[in-house]
């Protein structure tokens, strides 16, 4: 196999038994692909999807009078003004200007108004500004008002039809009531439901129910038509005392004979006997066409069609009449010889529609429509036109109802219609088919649907959500435009005058700014960002709510297999409602989640891979990945455990149709990062996958010794690492930039031969963690496309590295690891193993107030010189200054006055200057418990407001930096172009004299060295083709020079122009303070198996337990934390980690020994380590230098990969421990650091990858003496952010009462709470040196009195 540049440096020993034939897809594809298809990026001709489809669905808009029409032509997204970094800095949205080309068509008023015959009088075409559309960044996020946000995909109920029952919970009788629902993508929901009397009702949009026949009648069916649609008929020929029944033998099956059934004078079925299949077969054989039955047989049967009087034509008996004695008499009197009755068989088909029809009070189509109108619009007057318009708009018009492509496909599939396409509105046939299927289900001939299966839930991704917002905005615009079009010709209007962009841009802005699904990006580490973008939420608009979601919808469903992770979900009230995509899952064109499988044919696994949705999966028999397969792909076992129709079954290998693609297919990215996941309890695995997202990036990331093999994929797909676009050679590298000279073979003449990668240095993430990139390459390194060039936060050599590998011992230690507490060695802190950098952004605004503008200045009243020492003359802190709690970062004064100044007073003050006492100090200060170093200051000034000296110097610095970057880039590119020119000219004959070189002389590299680039560009050779290529390259250099010059001018203009600031803000100063935080008591740490704990003590190195060789333990964990938690994976990780470290020590010894045959010795040892188990590595292809470099990188341990559900076996761990010269038990004799005595028994020792979580004690620790109080109750505020106090609640009061601490209790309930007067007296007595507590009236009593007074009851207090 081919290794990448970084993989060669450090190979992870993979123990997976079966390699997947499919590589992991781009983990951010669900976001990026959806948005790209919405804006149709990189497509020359626009398809009918996304934004283009929205415009096409709303336009053309035609005037009411039909003489004007506005049509959509095309749209264009312009380049954003600022790049992503500038948007974050300035606090603006990274967006593109959307311009839409519309044409206004005016028709001749004298011509026909018919669409096809209208004469066009005039066409006015114009580009319309339709607002700003936020663009997705390369990492799948949006920058909204300077902050990175992620739009979470939504899992909602799929449009289509669904059949269900209430499980007998609705009615007290416990009777199961069936129902069905047609769910459109947009429009009214249509519900059909049975009541406990078995009548069928319809609800529109969950309104009051109506008999289903009312809807059918409104659709144009008569009573007779309704019965004909839903029932079969039986023909009866009437005689004087009996009647002949038309015989259909199959209909008699399972009924009880009401009379003797006789054929050829033989009694086939006696009266009172149940008719069986055998009887039916006999009757068919005999071939009876009719049977004579007594007239009493007709009683209680239902007439299927109207019976008319032959003479008058009047209806004698209407359809759906139950035959009683009187009806038989009427038939006899009128000499009716033939009637048709409904075939109703109690055991097969119920009379539901017939019974419901009798309840229906409507008789005609218009009456039925009126009835629906009164339910939908109660209280509104119902005219015939309004009634018809409402009914037609409900389900049958595109502008009000849309089933969508998905809905039509689901509806057709469920109803058994062959085609998956059709109209996006309902038809009469659709509604009738749904009712028929519901009756079938009620009769037991079909089954209800599973509501929670992923076949009935689809993903609505970002593109679709913005599409819906655009449609909402354009529909608002449409109403206004339609009215305006009537005046289009007379007022000489243009499209620009008619279209108002505000409703559209407001809808989009509202979605990105305040939608429940547009979330502040989780950016603690690369994994948290990837997981956030792959999150699937059932909450949000059009989804579920926490309160109403039951257990079933939250539970893991068999259809989640390979699509949604069964492990990763939040622990709180959102459990099961927020899920994460499985590693290989993707959405199909309908929005349903699909997972890949390998096709199995005749018991043989093929190389063909198919993506299958939950809808199609039901028909397949799917084997698991661990099924035994031979070298030729043949399934070896006779009986194989498979999944079929959501159940596990044992089947013959020939019946298997698909097989899983990979063992980690079931899990999400975070869950598949947990080694030995298969040995952990699911609850702890859930905590483990959630806590990995909270790991803070440490100063020096360290790869996990025990991983799962997916670490590299996560690191590269998260885009925190820098990856090469093309293969080439590293030309130059420093801390902030990497320059690659692209392979000349892969560079076309028109392309640049240089790639320049600028690295991110000490940038702030959303959670204030540090984003910093470090180069991995050296000058001269040969790299390939997609190789990792630079590490980002929490990555080590292109692999995800969330924590540190710590030497662990599972043992009790003086109670310091009681209840999951963690004991750590002082050495861990001294080595800065868990030191993290946190960057905080603090912002000061200078506003224009009613009393005059606020001023940023160093001249602040009543502030000492010492407090101003770190500020420059403008009043802004210096970069590099060390600041602590309470220090001023930006000096600012705000005008204060009792009265609002008149314009005249303002003018006088402006002329004669202001007095110092008219301003108050409103400076930006460092928070009480914070400290750090100022690493950057940015000043933004509004247009037409004069910039101060500091702002000008910052701008000049930024401009200088841009100029240097441009000069460097151009120098590199120009140098590369002329290097290629020299190569092209070399060896050719000169055609014209150039300086000292004569015509006809052969050009060599030595000759050309004497010439500068200017001279080189003038050389002409005899070969015309070479001259042409050289001219093209020189032209390219000049074009690049012009491009850079233009770019510099644009950047200069951007810097010099005023910033877009919030209303009323004149100036904005951003100060970035970096804090270095070491590990300390109270910080939270965790492993990857849900084994979390809080540091209880930092012990001196000499007190820690130590091994025989004197090496000390880094972390001591409680062994009692393992058995009850059932996360044994952590113990296995410790054993394998110990073996990995031991192998590293052996390699170190070999390198340090420096034997003559060292390379061979190391090569043989590495071959034994890598190729004795699991995946085989091709070490023979490595050169000696590469082997030595690989060995050098393995000094700290050989990294292992044990994929989830396909991990290393116990015997292999023991073999590795033996190979590393360590005890096979994984246990060692430890000695007490304080006494030197050995512990009683051997202890499990090894290496575990431990994380420092973003729950730091410094951010939580808080103390208050006095501080702010609530305005109404006058009680202290709560929370650290408000510098609040600690709540002393009801139960705490009981505790003090129990101890009889009366004085303390009085103090708590009065002066320390809301006794304002008492507080003042207390302060005075402390100042006077006395110790008196005098309580006056608590403010909460005054509040209570006020509330009683608001009820109209006066309360007066009497003095006693």
Swiss-Prot record:
Xref: PROSITE patterns: RNA_POL_BETA (PS01166)
Keywords: DNA-directed RNA polymerase, Nucleotidyltransferase, Transcription, Transferase
EC code(s) of this entry: 2.7.7.6
GO cellular component annotations of the record: DNA-directed RNA polymerase complex
GO molecular function, one term: ribonucleoside binding
Biological role: DNA-dependent RNA polymerase catalyzes the transcription of DNA into RNA using the four ribonucleoside triphosphates as substrates.
Family of the protein in this entry: Belongs to the RNA polymerase beta chain family.
Record note on quaternary structure: The RNAP catalytic core consists of 2 alpha, 1 beta, 1 beta' and 1 omega subunit. When a sigma factor is associated with the core the holoenzyme is formed, which can initiate transcription.
Protein name per Swiss-Prot or TrEMBL: DNA-directed RNA polymerase subunit beta
Organism, scientific name: Ruthia magnifica subsp. Calyptogena magnifica
Top-level taxonomy: Bacteria, Pseudomonadati, Pseudomonadota, Gammaproteobacteria, Candidatus Pseudothioglobaceae
Gene designation per UniProt: rpoB
């Amino acid at each position: 196999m081919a290794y990448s540049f970084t993989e060669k440096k450090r190979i992870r020993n993979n123990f997976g038994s079966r390699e997947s034939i499919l590589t992991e897809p781009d983990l951010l594809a669900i976001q990026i692909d959806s948005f790209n298809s919405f804006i149709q990026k990189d497509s020359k001709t626009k398809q009918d999807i996304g934004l283009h489809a929205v415009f096409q669905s709303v336009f053309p808009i035609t005037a009411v009078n039909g003489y004007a029409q506005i049509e959509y032509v095309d749209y264009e997204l312009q380049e954003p003004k600022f790049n992503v970094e500038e948007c974050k800095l300035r606090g603006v949205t990274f967006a593109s200007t959307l311009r839409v080309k519309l044409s206004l068509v005016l028709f001749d008023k004298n011509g026909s108004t018919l669409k096809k015959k209208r004469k066009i009088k005039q066409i006015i075409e114009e580009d319309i500004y339709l607002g700003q559309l936020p663009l997705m960044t390369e990492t799948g996020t949006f920058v909204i008002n300077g902050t990175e946000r992620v739009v979470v995909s939504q899992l909602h109920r799929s449009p289509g039809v669904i059949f269900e029952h209430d499980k007998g919970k609705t009615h007290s009788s416990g009777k199961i009531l069936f129902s069905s629902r047609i769910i459109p993508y947009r429009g009214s929901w249509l519900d059909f439901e049975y009541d406990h009397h078995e009548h069928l009702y319809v609800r529109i949009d969950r309104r009051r129910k109506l008999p289903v026949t009312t809807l059918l009648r409104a659709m144009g069916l008569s009573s007779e038509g309704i019965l004909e649609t839903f029932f079969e008929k039986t023909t009866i020929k009437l005689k004087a005392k009996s009647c002949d029944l038309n015989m259909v033998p199959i209909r008699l099956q399972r009924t009880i004979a009401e009379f003797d059934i006789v054929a050829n004078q033989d009694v086939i079925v006696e009266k009172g006997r149940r008719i069986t299949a055998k009887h039916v077969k006999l009757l068919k054989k005999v071939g009876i066409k009719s049977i004579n039955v007594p007239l009493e047989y007709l009683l209680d049967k239902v007439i299927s069609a109207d019976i008319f009087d032959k003479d008058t034509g009047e209806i004698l008996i209407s359809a759906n009449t139950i035959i009683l004695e009187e009806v038989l008499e009427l038939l006899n009197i009128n000499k009716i010889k033939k009637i048709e009755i409904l075939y109703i068989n109690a055991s097969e088909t119920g009379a539901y529609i017939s019974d419901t029809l009798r309840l229906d009070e409507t008789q005609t189509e218009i009456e039925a429509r009126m009835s629906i109108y009164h339910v939908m619009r109660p209280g509104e007057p119902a005219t015939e036109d309004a009634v018809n318009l409402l009914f037609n708009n409900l389900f049958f018009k595109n502008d009000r109802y849309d089933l969508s492509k998905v809905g039509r496909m689901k509806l057709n599939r469920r109803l058994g219609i062959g085609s998956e396409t059709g109209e996006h509105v309902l038809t009469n046939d659709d509604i009738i088919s749904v009712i028929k299927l519901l009756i079938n289900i009620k009769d037991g001939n079909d089954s209800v649907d599973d509501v929670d299966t992923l076949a009935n839930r689809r993903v609505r991704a970002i593109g679709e959500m913005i599409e819906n917002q655009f449609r909402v905005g354009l529909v608002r615009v449409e109403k206004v435009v339609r009215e305006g079009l009537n005046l289009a010709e007379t007022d000489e209007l243009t499209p620009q005058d008619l279209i108002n962009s505000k409703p559209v841009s407001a809808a989009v802005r509202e979605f990105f700014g305040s939608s429940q699904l547009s979330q502040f990006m989780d950016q603690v580490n690369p994994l948290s960002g990837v997981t956030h973008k792959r999150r699937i939420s059932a909450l949000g608009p059009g989804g579920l709510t926490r309160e109403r979601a039951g257990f079933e919808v939250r539970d893991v469903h068999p259809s989640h297999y390979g699509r949604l992770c069964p492990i990763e979900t939040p622990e709180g009230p959102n459990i099961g409602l927020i899920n994460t995509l499985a590693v290989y899952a993707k959405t199909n064109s309908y929005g349903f989640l699909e997972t890949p499988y390998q096709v199995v044919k005749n018991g043989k696994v093929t190389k063909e891979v198919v993506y299958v949705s939950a809808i199609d999966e039901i028909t397949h028999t799917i084997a698991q990945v661990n099924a035994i397969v031979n070298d030729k792909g043949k399934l070896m076992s006779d009986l194989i455990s498979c999944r079929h129709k959501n159940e596990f079954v044992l089947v013959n290998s020939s019946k298997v149709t698909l097989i899983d693609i990979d063992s980690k297919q079931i899990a999400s990215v975070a869950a598949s990062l947990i080694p030995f996941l298969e040995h952990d309890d699911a609850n702890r695995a859930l905590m483990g996958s959630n806590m990995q997202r909270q790991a803070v990036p440490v100063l020096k990331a360290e790869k996990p010794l025990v991983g799962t093999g997916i670490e590299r994929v996560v690191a590269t797909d998260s885009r925190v690492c820098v990856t090469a676009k093309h293969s080439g050679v590293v030309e130059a590298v420093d801390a902030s930039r990497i320059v690659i000279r692209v392979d000349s073979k892969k560079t076309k003449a028109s392309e640049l031969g240089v790639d320049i990668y600028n690295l991110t240095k000490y940038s702030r993430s959303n959670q204030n963690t540090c984003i910093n990139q470090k180069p991995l390459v050296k000058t001269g390194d040969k790299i390939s496309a997609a190789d990792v060039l630079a590490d980002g936060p929490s990555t080590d050599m292109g692999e995800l590295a969330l924590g540190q590998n710590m030497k662990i011992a599972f043992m009790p230690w003086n109670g310091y690891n009681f209840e999951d507490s963690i004991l750590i060695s002082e050495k861990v802190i001294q080595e800065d193993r868990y030191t993290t950098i946190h960057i905080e952004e603090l912002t000061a605004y200078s506003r224009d107030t009613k009393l005059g503008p606020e001023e940023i200045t160093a001249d602040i009243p009543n502030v000492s010189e010492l407090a101003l020492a770190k500020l420059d003359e403008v009043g802004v802190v210096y970069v590099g200054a060390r600041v602590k709690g309470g220090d001023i970062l930006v000096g600012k004064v705000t005008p204060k006055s009792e009265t609002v100044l008149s314009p005249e007073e303002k003018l006088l003050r402006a002329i004669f200057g202001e007095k110092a006492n008219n301003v108050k100090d409103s400076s930006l200060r460092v928070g009480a418990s914070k400290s750090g170093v100022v690493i950057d200051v940015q000043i933004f000034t509004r247009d037409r407001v004069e910039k101060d000296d500091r702002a000008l110097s910052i701008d000049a610095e930024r401009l200088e930096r841009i100029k240097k970057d441009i000069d460097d880039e151009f120098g590199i590119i120009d140098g590369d172009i002329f290097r290629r020119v020299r190569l092209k000219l070399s060896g050719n004959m000169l055609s014209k004299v150039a300086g000292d070189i004569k015509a006809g002389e052969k050009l060599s590299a030595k000759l050309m060295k004497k010439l500068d680039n200017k001279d080189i560009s003038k050389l002409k050779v005899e070969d015309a083709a070479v001259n042409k290529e050289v001219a093209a390259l020189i032209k390219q250099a000049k074009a690049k020079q012009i491009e850079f010059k233009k770019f510099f001018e644009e950047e200069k203009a951007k810097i010099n122009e005023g910033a877009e600031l919030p209303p009323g803000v004149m100036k904005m100063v951003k100060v970035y303070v970096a804090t270095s935080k070491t590990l300390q008591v109270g910080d939270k740490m965790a492993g990857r198996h849900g084994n979390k704990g809080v540091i209880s003590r930092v012990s001196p190195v000499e007190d820690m337990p130590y091994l025989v060789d004197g090496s000390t333990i880094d972390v001591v964990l409680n062994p009692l934390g393992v058995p009850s938690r059932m996360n044994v994976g952590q113990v296995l990780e410790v054993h394998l980690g110990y073996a990995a470290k031991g192998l590293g020590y052996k390699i170190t010894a070999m390198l340090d020994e420096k034997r003559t045959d060292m390379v061979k010795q190391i090569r043989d040892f590495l071959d034994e380590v890598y190729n004795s188990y699991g995946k085989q590595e091709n070490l023979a292809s490595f050169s000696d230098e590469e082997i030595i470099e690989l060995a050098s990188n393995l000094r700290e341990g050989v990294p292992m990969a044990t994929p989830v559900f396909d991990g290393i076996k116990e015997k292999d761990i023991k073999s590795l421990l033996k190979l590393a010269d360590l005890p096979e038990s994984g246990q060692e004799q430890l000695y007490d650091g304080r006494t030197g005595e050995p512990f009683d028994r051997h202890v499990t020792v090894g290496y575990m990858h431990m994380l420092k979580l973003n729950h730091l004690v410094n951010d939580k620790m808080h103390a208050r003496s006095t501080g702010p109080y609530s305005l109404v109750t006058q009680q202290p505020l709560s929370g650290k952010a408000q510098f609040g106090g600690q709540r002393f609640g009801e139960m705490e009061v009981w505790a003090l009462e129990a101890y009889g601490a009366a004085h303390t209790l009085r103090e708590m309930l009065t002066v320390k709470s809301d006794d304002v007067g008492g507080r003042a007296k207390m302060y005075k007595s402390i100042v006077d040196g006395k110790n008196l507590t005098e309580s006056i009236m608590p403010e909460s009593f005054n509040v209570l009195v006020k509330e009683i007074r608001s009820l109209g009851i006066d309360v007066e207090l009497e003095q006693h």
